[in-house]
Design a protein with these regions (language model features):
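NAD(P)H dinucleotide-binding glycine-rich loop of Rossmann-like/cofactor-binding domains
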Residues: 90-170
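Short glycine-/small-residue-rich Rossmann-like dinucleotide-binding loops
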Residues: 40, 72, 89, 240-241, ...
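C-terminal capping/lid region of NAD(P)-dependent oxidoreductase domains
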Residues: 2-5, 214, 226, 230, ...
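C-terminal substrate-binding/catalytic core of Rossmann-like NAD(P)-dependent dehydrogenases/reductases
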Residues: 269-320, 328-329
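Glycine-rich beta-strand-centered segment in the early N-terminal region that forms part
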Residues: 25-39, 52-97, 135-137
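Glycine-rich cofactor phosphate-binding loops and adjacent beta1-alpha1 units
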Residues: 202, 206-284
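Mid-domain Rossmann-like dinucleotide-binding core that forms the NAD(H)/NADP(H) cofactor-binding site
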Residues: 138-217, 222
Protein backbone atom coordinates (compact mmCIF):
# COMPACT_ATOMS: atom_id res chain seq x y z
CA UNK A 1 0.00 0.00 0.00
CA UNK A 2 1.11 3.55 -0.71
CA UNK A 3 1.55 6.32 1.81
CA UNK A 4 -1.71 7.58 3.32
CA UNK A 5 -2.55 11.09 2.21
CA UNK A 6 -4.89 13.80 3.48
CA UNK A 7 -5.89 17.29 2.42
CA UNK A 8 -4.19 20.25 4.06
CA UNK A 9 -3.85 23.96 3.38
CA UNK A 10 -0.26 25.19 3.18
CA UNK A 11 0.99 28.74 2.74
CA UNK A 12 3.14 28.98 -0.38
CA UNK A 13 5.38 31.63 1.19
CA UNK A 14 3.63 34.43 -0.67
CA UNK A 15 0.56 34.63 1.54
CA UNK A 16 -1.56 32.23 -0.50
CA UNK A 17 -3.00 29.06 1.03
CA UNK A 18 -3.12 26.14 -1.38
CA UNK A 19 -5.04 22.97 -0.57
CA UNK A 20 -3.02 19.92 -1.48
CA UNK A 21 -2.49 16.26 -0.63
CA UNK A 22 0.12 15.66 2.06
CA UNK A 23 1.14 12.61 4.13
CA UNK A 24 -0.82 11.82 7.27
CA UNK A 25 0.79 13.38 10.36
CA UNK A 26 3.57 11.46 12.05
CA UNK A 27 2.55 9.25 14.98
CA UNK A 28 4.58 8.98 18.16
CA UNK A 29 4.32 6.41 20.92
CA UNK A 30 0.99 6.87 22.73
CA UNK A 31 -0.12 9.72 20.45
CA UNK A 32 -3.71 9.85 19.24
CA UNK A 33 -5.02 10.39 15.73
CA UNK A 34 -7.74 13.04 15.61
CA UNK A 35 -9.99 14.00 12.72
CA UNK A 36 -10.24 17.77 12.61
CA UNK A 37 -13.80 19.08 12.48
CA UNK A 38 -13.40 22.81 13.05
CA UNK A 39 -10.46 25.21 13.47
CA UNK A 40 -10.19 28.92 14.11
CA UNK A 41 -7.95 31.41 12.32
CA UNK A 42 -5.94 33.19 15.01
CA UNK A 43 -4.44 36.66 14.71
CA UNK A 44 -1.03 35.01 15.04
CA UNK A 45 -1.81 32.89 11.96
CA UNK A 46 -2.41 36.10 10.03
CA UNK A 47 0.77 37.76 11.30
CA UNK A 48 2.89 34.71 10.49
CA UNK A 49 1.41 34.54 7.00
CA UNK A 50 2.53 38.10 6.28
CA UNK A 51 6.03 37.36 7.60
CA UNK A 52 6.61 33.93 6.04
CA UNK A 53 8.76 33.83 2.89
CA UNK A 54 9.05 30.07 2.42
CA UNK A 55 6.43 27.45 1.67
CA UNK A 56 5.02 25.60 4.65
CA UNK A 57 5.86 21.94 5.10
CA UNK A 58 3.26 21.35 7.83
CA UNK A 59 -0.16 23.00 8.18
CA UNK A 60 -0.67 25.50 10.97
CA UNK A 61 -3.83 26.07 13.03
CA UNK A 62 -3.96 25.70 16.82
CA UNK A 63 -7.62 26.48 17.68
CA UNK A 64 -8.84 22.95 17.07
CA UNK A 65 -11.78 20.70 17.87
CA UNK A 66 -12.06 17.19 16.50
CA UNK A 67 -12.97 13.54 16.94
CA UNK A 68 -10.60 10.87 18.20
CA UNK A 69 -10.06 8.21 15.54
CA UNK A 70 -7.33 6.15 17.21
CA UNK A 71 -5.94 6.29 20.74
CA UNK A 72 -3.99 3.91 22.92
CA UNK A 73 -4.08 3.37 26.66
CA UNK A 74 -4.42 6.64 28.54
CA UNK A 75 -5.29 7.88 32.02
CA UNK A 76 -8.05 10.22 30.80
CA UNK A 77 -10.50 7.48 29.80
CA UNK A 78 -10.56 8.76 26.24
CA UNK A 79 -11.74 6.42 23.50
CA UNK A 80 -12.26 6.58 19.73
CA UNK A 81 -15.33 8.65 18.91
CA UNK A 82 -14.83 11.13 21.74
CA UNK A 83 -15.19 14.79 20.80
CA UNK A 84 -12.26 16.85 22.07
CA UNK A 85 -10.73 20.29 22.20
CA UNK A 86 -7.06 19.88 21.40
CA UNK A 87 -4.30 21.70 23.27
CA UNK A 88 -1.84 21.83 20.40
CA UNK A 89 1.08 23.79 21.81
CA UNK A 90 1.89 22.53 25.29
CA UNK A 91 0.18 19.50 26.82
CA UNK A 92 -0.36 17.83 23.45
CA UNK A 93 3.40 17.61 22.89
CA UNK A 94 4.73 17.50 26.46
CA UNK A 95 7.14 14.96 27.94
CA UNK A 96 5.32 15.19 31.32
CA UNK A 97 8.61 14.48 33.12
CA UNK A 98 10.68 17.67 33.03
CA UNK A 99 10.64 20.33 35.75
CA UNK A 100 8.08 22.44 33.88
CA UNK A 101 5.72 19.57 33.11
CA UNK A 102 5.80 18.38 36.72
CA UNK A 103 4.68 21.87 37.75
CA UNK A 104 1.83 21.94 35.22
CA UNK A 105 3.65 24.30 32.85
CA UNK A 106 3.63 22.01 29.83
CA UNK A 107 4.02 24.84 27.33
CA UNK A 108 7.54 25.33 28.66
CA UNK A 109 8.43 21.63 28.36
CA UNK A 110 12.10 21.26 27.50
CA UNK A 111 11.65 17.88 25.80
CA UNK A 112 8.58 18.53 23.64
CA UNK A 113 7.99 16.03 20.87
CA UNK A 114 8.29 17.09 17.26
CA UNK A 115 5.48 19.20 15.81
CA UNK A 116 3.35 17.13 13.44
CA UNK A 117 1.14 19.86 11.99
CA UNK A 118 -2.01 21.73 12.91
CA UNK A 119 -5.70 22.12 12.34
CA UNK A 120 -5.67 23.36 8.76
CA UNK A 121 -5.36 19.74 7.70
CA UNK A 122 -7.86 16.90 7.88
CA UNK A 123 -6.02 15.01 10.64
CA UNK A 124 -3.69 15.81 13.51
CA UNK A 125 -1.77 13.78 16.08
CA UNK A 126 -1.29 14.80 19.70
CA UNK A 127 -0.67 13.10 23.03
CA UNK A 128 -3.69 12.27 25.22
CA UNK A 129 -2.48 14.81 27.79
CA UNK A 130 -3.49 17.53 25.33
CA UNK A 131 -7.00 16.20 24.62
CA UNK A 132 -9.95 17.57 26.60
CA UNK A 133 -13.32 15.91 26.19
CA UNK A 134 -16.20 18.14 25.16
CA UNK A 135 -19.59 17.70 26.82
CA UNK A 136 -22.45 16.81 24.50
CA UNK A 137 -23.95 20.25 25.17
CA UNK A 138 -21.05 22.01 23.40
CA UNK A 139 -21.11 22.04 19.61
CA UNK A 140 -18.07 22.10 17.35
CA UNK A 141 -18.03 25.88 17.14
CA UNK A 142 -17.70 26.15 20.91
CA UNK A 143 -15.14 23.36 20.81
CA UNK A 144 -12.89 25.37 18.53
CA UNK A 145 -13.30 28.39 20.83
CA UNK A 146 -11.89 26.59 23.87
CA UNK A 147 -8.33 27.56 22.94
CA UNK A 148 -8.80 31.36 22.86
CA UNK A 149 -10.96 31.19 25.97
CA UNK A 150 -8.21 29.24 27.73
CA UNK A 151 -5.69 31.95 26.80
CA UNK A 152 -7.72 34.51 28.76
CA UNK A 153 -8.39 32.09 31.60
CA UNK A 154 -4.64 31.63 31.92
CA UNK A 155 -3.94 35.37 31.77
CA UNK A 156 -6.34 36.26 34.56
CA UNK A 157 -5.43 33.26 36.72
CA UNK A 158 -1.75 34.11 36.31
CA UNK A 159 -2.39 37.74 37.27
CA UNK A 160 -4.24 36.54 40.39
CA UNK A 161 -7.27 38.66 39.60
CA UNK A 162 -9.53 39.07 42.62
CA UNK A 163 -13.29 39.31 42.89
CA UNK A 164 -14.23 42.99 42.95
CA UNK A 165 -11.29 44.11 40.79
CA UNK A 166 -11.76 46.74 38.11
CA UNK A 167 -10.39 45.26 34.89
CA UNK A 168 -9.51 47.06 31.69
CA UNK A 169 -9.22 45.24 28.37
CA UNK A 170 -7.43 46.93 25.47
CA UNK A 171 -8.86 45.58 22.23
CA UNK A 172 -12.02 43.62 21.48
CA UNK A 173 -10.94 41.01 19.00
CA UNK A 174 -11.11 37.33 19.94
CA UNK A 175 -8.75 37.42 22.94
CA UNK A 176 -10.03 40.76 24.17
CA UNK A 177 -13.59 39.45 24.09
CA UNK A 178 -12.68 36.25 25.90
CA UNK A 179 -10.85 38.35 28.49
CA UNK A 180 -14.04 40.33 29.10
CA UNK A 181 -15.97 37.09 29.60
CA UNK A 182 -13.38 35.63 31.97
CA UNK A 183 -13.08 38.84 33.99
CA UNK A 184 -16.84 38.99 34.48
CA UNK A 185 -16.98 35.29 35.34
CA UNK A 186 -14.19 35.70 37.89
CA UNK A 187 -16.15 38.48 39.59
CA UNK A 188 -14.80 41.77 38.26
CA UNK A 189 -16.65 44.74 39.69
CA UNK A 190 -16.39 46.55 36.36
CA UNK A 191 -14.86 45.76 32.99
CA UNK A 192 -13.82 48.60 30.69
CA UNK A 193 -13.01 47.69 27.09
CA UNK A 194 -11.76 49.50 24.03
CA UNK A 195 -12.88 48.56 20.53
CA UNK A 196 -12.12 49.84 17.07
CA UNK A 197 -14.81 48.44 14.77
CA UNK A 198 -18.62 48.45 15.09
CA UNK A 199 -18.87 44.65 15.34
CA UNK A 200 -16.28 44.69 18.14
CA UNK A 201 -18.16 47.37 20.07
CA UNK A 202 -21.39 45.37 19.84
CA UNK A 203 -19.65 42.12 20.80
CA UNK A 204 -17.87 43.69 23.80
CA UNK A 205 -21.21 44.81 25.17
CA UNK A 206 -22.73 41.35 24.61
CA UNK A 207 -19.80 39.73 26.41
CA UNK A 208 -20.54 41.81 29.50
CA UNK A 209 -18.28 44.87 29.35
CA UNK A 210 -19.70 47.61 31.57
CA UNK A 211 -18.06 50.40 29.56
CA UNK A 212 -16.95 50.25 25.92
CA UNK A 213 -14.98 53.11 24.38
CA UNK A 214 -13.33 53.71 21.04
CA UNK A 215 -9.65 53.13 20.41
CA UNK A 216 -8.95 56.87 20.17
CA UNK A 217 -6.03 58.03 22.27
CA UNK A 218 -6.98 58.86 25.84
CA UNK A 219 -10.53 57.49 25.85
CA UNK A 220 -9.65 54.15 27.40
CA UNK A 221 -7.44 55.65 30.07
CA UNK A 222 -10.10 58.21 30.99
CA UNK A 223 -12.76 55.50 31.20
CA UNK A 224 -10.61 53.37 33.53
CA UNK A 225 -10.01 56.32 35.85
CA UNK A 226 -13.67 57.36 35.74
CA UNK A 227 -14.80 53.83 36.63
CA UNK A 228 -12.40 53.65 39.57
CA UNK A 229 -12.93 57.03 41.19
CA UNK A 230 -9.74 58.43 39.69
CA UNK A 231 -7.46 55.57 40.74
CA UNK A 232 -7.09 53.45 37.60
CA UNK A 233 -7.83 49.81 36.82
CA UNK A 234 -6.53 47.08 39.13
CA UNK A 235 -5.59 45.01 36.10
CA UNK A 236 -5.32 45.98 32.44
CA UNK A 237 -5.09 43.28 29.77
CA UNK A 238 -3.32 44.32 26.56
CA UNK A 239 -4.79 41.94 23.96
CA UNK A 240 -3.79 43.50 20.64
CA UNK A 241 -0.04 43.33 20.12
CA UNK A 242 1.05 43.16 16.50
CA UNK A 243 3.10 45.74 14.62
CA UNK A 244 2.52 48.68 16.96
CA UNK A 245 3.36 49.63 20.53
CA UNK A 246 0.87 52.35 21.47
CA UNK A 247 -1.51 49.92 23.19
CA UNK A 248 1.34 48.76 25.46
CA UNK A 249 1.85 52.29 26.74
CA UNK A 250 -1.89 52.94 26.82
CA UNK A 251 -2.33 49.91 29.07
CA UNK A 252 0.28 51.18 31.52
CA UNK A 253 -1.31 54.62 31.63
CA UNK A 254 -4.70 53.10 32.50
CA UNK A 255 -3.38 50.92 35.34
CA UNK A 256 -3.50 52.11 38.94
CA UNK A 257 -0.38 52.55 41.04
CA UNK A 258 0.80 49.11 42.21
CA UNK A 259 -1.64 47.51 39.77
CA UNK A 260 -0.90 44.94 37.07
CA UNK A 261 -0.58 45.30 33.33
CA UNK A 262 -1.01 41.90 31.66
CA UNK A 263 0.88 41.88 28.39
CA UNK A 264 -0.97 39.28 26.33
CA UNK A 265 -0.98 40.59 22.76
CA UNK A 266 2.68 40.19 21.82
CA UNK A 267 4.34 43.03 19.92
CA UNK A 268 6.12 42.11 16.68
CA UNK A 269 8.32 45.20 16.39
CA UNK A 270 11.20 46.75 18.34
CA UNK A 271 9.77 49.14 20.91
CA UNK A 272 11.04 52.29 22.54
CA UNK A 273 9.88 51.99 26.13
CA UNK A 274 9.48 54.87 28.53
CA UNK A 275 8.96 52.92 31.73
CA UNK A 276 9.57 55.75 34.20
CA UNK A 277 5.81 56.12 34.82
CA UNK A 278 5.43 52.38 35.42
CA UNK A 279 8.46 52.40 37.72
CA UNK A 280 7.37 55.40 39.75
CA UNK A 281 3.89 53.95 40.18
CA UNK A 282 5.23 50.43 40.83
CA UNK A 283 3.11 48.85 38.12
CA UNK A 284 3.80 45.16 37.63
CA UNK A 285 4.10 44.21 33.96
CA UNK A 286 3.32 40.53 33.46
CA UNK A 287 4.04 38.77 30.17
CA UNK A 288 1.58 35.94 29.64
CA UNK A 289 1.18 33.43 26.82
CA UNK A 290 -0.95 30.37 26.12
CA UNK A 291 -2.13 28.16 29.00
CA UNK A 292 -1.06 25.85 31.80
CA UNK A 293 -2.25 23.79 34.73
CA UNK A 294 -2.59 25.31 38.19
CA UNK A 295 -3.70 23.52 41.36
CA UNK A 296 -4.26 20.41 39.27
CA UNK A 297 -6.73 22.12 36.92
CA UNK A 298 -5.83 22.96 33.32
CA UNK A 299 -6.98 26.26 31.81
CA UNK A 300 -8.73 24.24 29.08
CA UNK A 301 -10.94 22.59 31.70
CA UNK A 302 -12.04 25.94 33.09
CA UNK A 303 -12.61 27.28 29.57
CA UNK A 304 -14.82 24.31 28.70
CA UNK A 305 -16.89 24.76 31.87
CA UNK A 306 -17.21 28.47 31.18
CA UNK A 307 -18.41 27.93 27.61
CA UNK A 308 -20.77 25.19 28.76
CA UNK A 309 -22.37 27.54 31.30
CA UNK A 310 -23.61 29.65 28.37
CA UNK A 311 -23.61 32.72 30.62
CA UNK A 312 -22.20 34.86 27.80
CA UNK A 313 -22.83 34.29 24.06
CA UNK A 314 -19.16 33.88 23.18
CA UNK A 315 -20.08 31.60 20.28
CA UNK A 316 -21.54 34.64 18.53
CA UNK A 317 -18.07 36.03 17.85
CA UNK A 318 -17.73 33.48 15.02
CA UNK A 319 -18.90 35.70 12.18
CA UNK A 320 -17.74 33.65 9.19
CA UNK A 321 -17.19 29.99 8.31
CA UNK A 322 -15.42 28.53 5.29
CA UNK A 323 -14.59 24.98 4.27
CA UNK A 324 -10.97 23.97 3.81
CA UNK A 325 -11.07 24.48 0.04
CA UNK A 326 -11.96 28.13 0.65
CA UNK A 327 -9.47 28.80 3.42
CA UNK A 328 -7.87 31.65 1.45
CA UNK A 329 -11.20 33.50 1.52
CA UNK A 330 -11.25 32.86 5.25
CA UNK A 331 -7.84 34.46 5.71
CA UNK A 332 -8.83 37.41 3.52
CA UNK A 333 -11.96 38.04 5.58
CA UNK A 334 -10.19 37.50 8.90
CA UNK A 335 -7.52 40.03 7.88
CA UNK A 336 -10.06 42.69 6.93
CA UNK A 337 -12.02 43.82 9.99
CA UNK A 338 -13.97 46.24 7.81
CA UNK A 339 -15.65 43.10 6.46
CA UNK A 340 -17.42 42.76 9.80
CA UNK A 341 -15.36 39.77 10.87
CA UNK A 342 -14.32 38.89 14.38
CA UNK A 343 -13.53 35.17 14.39
CA UNK A 344 -13.35 33.08 11.21
CA UNK A 345 -13.64 29.28 11.43
CA UNK A 346 -12.55 26.63 8.96
CA UNK A 347 -14.72 23.52 8.76
CA UNK A 348 -13.76 20.12 7.38
Amino acid sequence: MGEKLMKAALDNGQGDYLVQKVPFPKRFKNSALIKVIQSGICGSDIHLTTERNESQILPSGHEVAGEIIEIGNNNKNLVPGDRVAVEMIGAGRACLNCIYCKNGQMRHCIHRIEDTGGGFGEYITRLPSGLFKLPDSLDWTNGALVEPMAVSVHALRYSQMQKGDIVGVVGSSTIGLSSIVVAKTFGAKKVIASARYPQQIEAAKKMGADVVVSSKSGEFEDACFDASGGIGADIVVESIGGHQSETFHQSIRATKSQGKMVYLGGMKIPMELDLIDASLREIRIESVMCYSESNGIHDYEIAIDLLDSNRFPYKDIVTHRFNLENIQKGFDIASDKKSGSIKVHITM
